[in-house]
Amino acid sequence: MMILMLSYSNMINWENIFANSNTFKNNKPFPYGFIENFFHEDFYNELYNTYPKIDESWYVPTDSTRYAKKKWFGTANPNSDQKSVDQEDPSFSRTWNQFFHYMHSKEFLDNMSKYSDIVLTGFNHFSFIVNEKGSFNMPHTHHPTEQKKDYSYNLTLLVYF
């Protein structure tokens, strides 16, 4: 497997993200934020223009809490507890692979930790989700039996296109 070494400086608009950090940290009843222009515009446009097309590789979860088409990156298995692994996925564009690699980098995790004030060491899952007419996601928790100190979903990042 070949993982390209890339320059990540033109992907994420960290200045804008950090400018919204205090809002995230102080929102009630829990920390949350909404950041416009998360990506630099050129990089966003590349991601948008190469967003994966819906085909037979997408699936629909069968539980009653959601109905939306999903596609996982690489060899991820939606039915396992395996953490996300940095890898190339030739079914996605070079730009999506670059972003996926960057999300696994120390720089990305350190910056998201700085933004959120939550120490992050990795992430669990990465998926594409398409909500069409009739799609839904019910309010839910991913691991309702875990104690807060053990909770594996410390930060959820949703990027909309």
Question: Where in this protein do the model-derived segments appear?
Answer:
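Non-heme Fe(II)/2-oxoglutarate
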Residues: 6, 12-15, 22-111
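Short hydrophobic "helix-edge" motifs at membrane interfaces and signal-peptide entry regions
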Residues: 20-22, 130
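Methionine residue identity
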Residues: 1-5
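Catalytic core of non-heme Fe(II) oxygenases with the double-stranded beta-helix
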Residues: 88-161
